[in-house]
Amino acid sequence: MTIRHLSETIINQIAAGEVIERPASVIKELVENAIDAGATRIEVVTAGGGKTLLRVTDNGSGIPADELALAVSRHCTSKLTDDVHDIRALGFRGEALPSIGSVSKLTLKSRPQDADSGFEVCVTGGHLDGPRPTALNRGTIVEVRDLFYATPARLKFMKTDRAEATAITDVVKRIGIAFPHIRFSLAGTDRTPFEMPATGTGAEATLERIGQVLGREFGENALAIDAERDGVRLAGFVGIPSFNRGNALHQFAYVNGRPVRDKQIFGALRGAYSDVIARDRHPVAVLFLTLDPALVDVNVHPAKADVRFRDPGLVRGLIVGAIKQALAQSGIRPATSGAEAMLQAFRAEGFGAQQSAPRPANSYSPASWRTAPPAPRSEWSPQTAQTAHRPLDLQAAPALRENGQAVLGDVAVPASDARASVAEAPVELMQKPLGAARAQIHENYIVAQTEDSLVIVDQHAAHERLVYEALKNALHARPIAGQMLLIPEIVDLPEEDAQRLAGHAETLARFGLGVEQFGPGAIAVRETPAMLGEMNVQQLIRDLADEIAEHDTADGLKAMLHHVAATMACHGSVRSGRRLKPEEMNALLRDMEATPGSGTCNHGRPTYIELKLTDIERLFGRR
C-alpha cells in the first residue's frame, strides 16, 4: 500500500474519536473554552440528549473576526506559546473546535468586548464557510447540531437521550464546583432547567457552590481541608465518616482548577478513610490540589482527564495525612442525615404499624444497622489470604494483648445479673457531647441524654473502636516484634524492584519485617512480623514491591497489621447481651468522646445516633 497524507477532514475525525466521545465531551470542551475566555456567565442549552443540539453562550472576551477561521483550525490556540510544561489554561491543544466541526454542523459566533458587531463562521463536516457579520451581544456562542452526522457509526454507541442529558449535567456541575464566581445555567427540551448562581470567591463561596451540587447536607457534615507540603497545597472539604455513599459519584478532584479522574488521588482518598467506613461505602469529598504546572503533566490524554505527577508519593502522602488529621480532630459528630432517616422510618411505619414500609436507601437506615457487618479484609490478594489470614495466635503479640485487656478493663462487665435501670447522673455530664447514660436497653444499647438531645449507643461497636484505636497506638508506639526465620527466604524480583524495596528496609523493620538485598535481583527475608503468624512471604514481598513501584510507600504491610488489630478488637470488645452498670456506661461515653474516629466501628457502621429534642417533638406533632 502507498503511504500518503490524510486529508485535513479525516485527521480531524480521527482526533474527534479521542476528544469527542459523547455530547458531554463537547460541552466540557466548550465550557472550558468559555472559562479560559474570562466568562462570568455561561449558559448551556441542549436537545435530544445533545445529539440534536448543543449550544454554549458566554460573556467572555470573544474572538476577533480575523481569528475565527483560525479558531476552527487544528492546533491553533491562544493559550500556549512555546512551553508545554507551563500550562495554566484548561484548554491548550487547539483540537476541540476543529474536531467538533469535523463530525457535526458547527456555528461559531463571537463579538469581542471592544467590537461594534459580531461575526460568525460555519463548519459542516469539516468544510468552512465564512466569516460573515451577525447580530450578537458581546461574548461567544458555539452551536453544535446533528452531532456525529458525518460519522453515523458513532451514534450506535450513544446512550438514551436521558442518559446523555444526565452526563451533560454532571460535567457542568463538576466544572462549576471549581469556579464558584461563574454563573452556570442548563436548559433544553430534554431536561429540567438547572442553575448555579455565582457565589463569589474563597472557601465559604466554594462550600456554598458545593452545596448547590451535592445538597445542603454536605455542608452540614463537611470538614475543611487545608494543608501544604513541599510546594503542593491541598484544600477542599470531606464528609465525616458517617456521611458516606454507596458509590464514588460524589467524589470530585481538581488539579490547578482542572477536573480530573485520577486513580492516585481517589486511591489516597480511599486509604484515608480505610479505618472508618465500610469497604462497600464511599466517602464524599471535594479536593483541590494546587502546584507548580511543571510538577504535573496534564498532557497525558487528549481529553485531559488524567494527569501524571512528578512525585506521586508526595501527593498521596499529603492527601492521606491531611484527611486523617481532619478526621481525628473532628471529634464526636454524627451525620445530620441519621436523625432524618429515623424520622422518615417512623413516619413510614407509623405507630403500631404491623408492616414495615421501605426505609431510605442510605447508610443510616435502621435496617442496615442490624445487618451483620462484613468481615474486615486486608488489601492483599486472595492468594495471600490463604496463608496470612489464619486463626489469631494471641500469644504472638503479648504487648498488644495486654493493651487490649487494659482497654477492656476500663469498661469492665459486671458479674451481677441486675438489670440496668434509669440512672441518676450529675447535671454536668449532660453538657458532654454524648451526655449522661440513663439506661441500657436490650442489653446492647446505651441510652444517654444531653441538654438538647437523646443519644443511643451500640455498646459493642463503640467499644470495638476504642480497643482498635488502643491497639493501633500500641503498634505505632514501639517497633513490632519480629520472628526470625530458621532459613532466610529468597525472593526473586526484577532488579529495579529489588533496589526500591531494599531502600525501604528501615521502614519495614519497624513493622517486624527484616529484608536485605541479596544480589542484583533478589531480596532475602530474615524476619517476619510475629503477630501475622505463618504467611506467604513470597507473595507479601511481591505485593510490597508492586506497591512501592506505584506509590513509593510500603503501607500494605501496615494495613495487614491493622487488619489483625481490628480482628482482635472485634473479638475482645464488650459483646451484645452484656449488662453494664451506669458508671461503666458513662465511662464508655467519655472514652468515645476522647477517641478519634469513635463515630464508626472498625467495619464502618455507626456507633451511635443522636436525636435532637426538636426531632423528637416533631415525631409527636409538637413542631
Swiss-Prot record:
Q: What is this protein called?
A: DNA mismatch repair protein MutL
Keyword flag DNA repair: yes
Q: Which residue positions does the secretion signal occupy?
A: none
Quote the function comment for this protein. Answer: This protein is involved in the repair of mismatches in DNA. It is required for dam-dependent methyl-directed DNA mismatch repair. May act as a 'molecular matchmaker', a protein that promotes the formation of a stable complex between two or more DNA-binding proteins in an ATP-dependent manner without itself being part of a final effector complex.
Q: Where is the composition biased (Polar residues)?
A: 353-368
Region labeled Disordered — which residues?
353-389
Coiled-coil residues are none
A Pfam match: MutL_C
Taxonomic superkingdom? Bacteria
Q: Which GO terms describe its cellular component?
A: mismatch repair complex
Gene3D superfamilies named in the record: 3.30.230.10, Histidine kinase-like ATPase, C-terminal domain (3.30.565.10), MutL, C-terminal domain, dimerisation subdomain (3.30.1540.20), MutL, C-terminal domain, regulatory subdomain (3.30.1370.100)
Alphabetized, the UniProt keywords read: DNA damage, DNA repair
Disulfide cross-links: none
Belongs to which family?
A: Belongs to the DNA mismatch repair MutL/HexB family.
Q: Which NCBIfam families match?
A: mutl (TIGR00585), PRK00095.2-4 (NF000953)
| GO BP terms in the entry | mismatch repair
Q: What PROSITE patterns is this protein classified in?
A: DNA_MISMATCH_REPAIR_1
Does the keyword rRNA-binding belong to this entry? Answer: no
A GO molecular function annotation here is:
ATP binding
